[in-house]
Amino acid sequence: MSHRLLLIVGSGPPLMRRYLMEAAAAYSPLLLIDDAPPTWQRPYTVDHETADLTDPLAVTAAADALAARWNIAGVLTWDEYCLMAAARLAERYGLPGNVPDAVGAARDKAVSRQRFAAANVPSAASTWVHSLAAAASAAERVGYPAVLKPAAHAGSVGVVRVDALTDLPRTWAIAEAGAAHQGAEGQGVLLEEYLDGPEISVETATYRGVTTAVAVTRKSLGFKPYFMETGHCVTAGDPLLTTVAPIAEAALRALGITNGISHVEMRLTADGPRLIEVNARCGGDLIGDLVRRATGVDLARAAAAIACGHIPDLHPTEDRSAAIGMLYPPAEGIVTHRELRPGRDQHLEHFQWLRDVGDTATLTPSSTTPNNIRAGYAVVSGDSAHDAQQHLADVLARADVRVTSTVPRAA
């Protein structure tokens, strides 16, 4: 009981979360609560308990069992759907963290919009809608294009653009299907004003109420009317940071976020930056890894430090760019061939296939996991954003995926 350990709630999938576990384990011995016994997580953990992560009582019982065996120094999650559980546990044990009210406000986008408006943080007009008719009425007030989204989902699940009244039946069905799986922190669907302009996120670290904006992530989107994030690029010293940092800080204050890493999404509209949402955790799609490669700041390690009540090291040591780009199949069908053709790979940090030969490839986002359409991804680095994007384009152009619409016959 002499050593103090960091409790992780929900590890997530290894391809996108292993780097977070590695960094956290390098900072502190780890305990884990997850919905299955550890496999890939085992080298990083000292002890674990299994629990249904959607059941607050089960998670609390698992944490209490670990607390009886170990001295817990902090509680951390990078899973959007475990944020409330982590906040409640930190409060239960008197550990550093965000109060559940603040985390709940970040999770529920309807509450977020209310708090942004009260604090004069530029955001989007938003209305909770309970039916197709209510969505039509709200869209008439807001104007087209508009956006339908579940109130408390993540990963662009169920988020869809509505260009006209005739689009509403189809887009409402998409948003409603997504809302069925969003978790207890938010209910139903929001109809929101469409914010036109490039999408970015600000990666921040908050320690005892003081926020540092570490980096800007510039995003690429695709697959209209969906808002699929097809790529991200981080550049050290991005000049946009000085413009958007105060808005990100104001958004976190409005919600009451006082500790941890946050991923603050915005659109750069003609009227200036405006908030999309705040995720009170490290960004997905390896964004924390991009920040580390570009700036030298390790957000995963900083998250572990803050969770344990320690001052995070946010000193930049690199002056580069890093980018990730997603690979998609050319059509729907069965994957018959995949190959990364030879080329100049000195700037390629990592390439990962997500579909094997024989797998079904789709271009239709799922209502539970819209990134099901991805066939792979590449991470690259460069001396500038332009260089990184050029290197990324080269790698993705060399990635060959072929599909057939005919299911191969069994031998």
Per-region residue spans from a language model:
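Conserved ATP-binding module of the ATP-grasp superfamily
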Residues: P122-A124, P145-L148, R161-G197, V216, ...
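ATP-dependent carboxylate/phosphate-activation module, predominantly the ATP-grasp catalytic core
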Residues: T166, E192-I257, I261, L268, ...
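A conserved helix-loop-beta module that forms one wall/lid of the active-site cleft
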Residues: R92-G158, L165
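Short, well-ordered beta-strand elements within core beta-sheets of diverse protein domains
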Residues: V160, E193, A236, R374-G382
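A short, glycine/Asx- and small/polar-enriched loop/turn
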Residues: G143, L268-R274, T369-N372
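ATP-binding N-terminal substructure of ATP-dependent carboxylate-amine bond-forming enzymes
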Residues: M1-A102, A133, D359-T360, T368-I373, ...
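Peripheral (often C-terminal) accessory segments that flank ATP-dependent C-N-forming ligase machineries
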Residues: L30, A118, A304-A411
